[in-house]
Amino acid sequence: MIAMKPARTLAMAGALALFASQAAHAQWLDLYGTRKNVSASPAAPMLKNATCQPELADRPIELEDAILQAICANPQARRAWADARAQAAQLGVKEAAYLPTLNATAGIQRNWQTTTYEQDLGPITLTADQKQIQTSRYGALNLSWVLFDFGKRSAALRQARELLAAANATQDDTLQTLLFNAAQAYYNLRDTQAALDAARTTERVAQDSLTAAKAKHDAGAGTLSDQLQAQTSYRRAVLDRVSAEGDVRNATGVLAVAMGLDANTPLRIATAEPPVDRNAFAEGIAQLIDEAKRQHPKLVAARAKLDAARANVDAVRAQGRPTISLTGSLSRNSPSYQQQPGIQTTASHGSMIGVQVTIPLFEGFASGYRVAAAQAQADAQEADVQNTELNVSLDVWKSYQSLQTDTANLDNSKDLLGDAQRSLDIARGRYKAGVGTFTELLNAQTALADAQKQRVQALSKWRTARLKLAASLGSIGLWSAH
């Protein structure tokens, strides 16, 4: 019986385990430098010199705080970043196709076999057992290296690069969308707070008018009708104030969610009103549309996907071309036989190297259909690019016109508010002096409330139009949110 050689067996097993562990560890190494093609963090493309703040400071939230929290904590940013990293890894897969593949196979097995022979000698039957034990150890290394594939790998690599560019552009677009939503939610909360302040002012004015009407009625100088009208106006003002308080709570929840927080998170924003910058976007509409067509991330992503689709056409065409590969192998087989009465041991080992040419000859005309499908996908993507260009130009046009209108209404709403305030002061004085009617006072009071709402809406619409124009240009950033 042949004794097994445990040292050699353990050495072979250890070598294979070491090789396997190194191969498994290599998959975590970015040998092709693909990580440099994606951002270092989910919010890095938008942050520039700013930094993420893990916790909000104990102070009123500024607009920049809300934006940073939104792009740093919102799960949509992490999802877009993960998609970009996944596509970068796919680029590494395509790069790896240019290197050879090496596979190892090894094993050991032991077989036992017993054969019983019987011979009948009349009254006596002779029985003999023959035992055979086979131990086999084998190992092999197989090498395969594609030398020429007539453009298949290069087309696949080009496709992966374009898809990575599209993923990066999509990440940029996601961050800009998050910034826009956070800024809009922040300004919406500020606008609802301003509307609440206006509602409280209207309530105080209505209460003052009610007090004056009641005093005149008690003194016998006013009518009960005037007092009831004043009381009705006051009740309406209270209803408007309560509704405004609900709008503030809703707007607070929207901002919290935009910042990646729970909707019930209490927030306190700064009340200081930023200066109105009328000089932004002073370029002509044609120049703005051209700028959007150059840099809008949606268009950048669409064009990259078009280039990837065209590269896929080349890759599909190359599948029908020959492939030339270098192949090689090293093998060893050491079976050992132990049987009665003798011992037999054999071993074999060999090596091979060669060049293999694979030529697709016929596959049922499937290659032509694959090329046609890939070309149709490229045509569809080209149509998507044209459609995206039209949508971008329309968004820029509408946002630009809205900004022009809302900018003009800033002065109009300011003048309207001033006139309404002076009208109320005059009507109140005339009513107290007994020369004016309560209807005149009530009309002036209503006009002031409307003017306050118009002013709040004018500022809100101007800021929203400015944000939308920046977003339609694909250039929204921390600076444009202000």
Residues of each region from the PLM?
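Amphipathic alpha-helical coiled-coil segments
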Residues: 79-95, 174, 178-197, 208, ...
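Acidic, low-complexity, intrinsically disordered peripheral segments
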Residues: 3-7, 12, 25-37, 112, ...
